[in-house]
């Protein structure tokens, strides 16, 4: 067996960076109820991992909106970016969730890259 390959390289995962930004998970971007706060643990161009600050319960395949405030990343406008996401996994014990970004909008990609760039320096 050849163990010389990096773990990320061997399973073709996108580069991920660690973050500690507070984010919100919503059912709909405009709906002010049922918002769950979470800590963004890591992010890549394809997806994310978060840990909720309180109780939450989501299912695999659920379509949600992840709202990421941009000021902690040195971006003054817009205030936040809301990205449609799909839940890939949810851990009820750890209150953690991982998912993928559903929107390939070039603006979203630019903001996610900026978040990753700033997070690398933390």
Label the model's feature ranges.
Residues 2-3, 94-122:
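C-terminal output/interaction extensions
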Residues 45-46, 90-95:
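Short, conserved beta-turn/loop elements at beta-strand boundaries and strand-helix junctions
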Residues 36-38, 81-88:
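Short beta-strand-centered aromatic/proline hotspots
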Residues 1-45, 51, 116-122:
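N-terminal helix initiation/capping motif
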Residues 18-24, 54-72:
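Short coil-to-beta transition motif at edge beta-strands of beta-rich domains
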Residues 51-55, 102:
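A structural micro-motif recognizing beta-strand termini
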Residues 17, 32, 60-62, 79, ...:
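Residue-level preference for beta-strand/loop junctions
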Residues 71-82:
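Short, Lys/Arg- and Gly-enriched loop/turn segments at beta-strand edges
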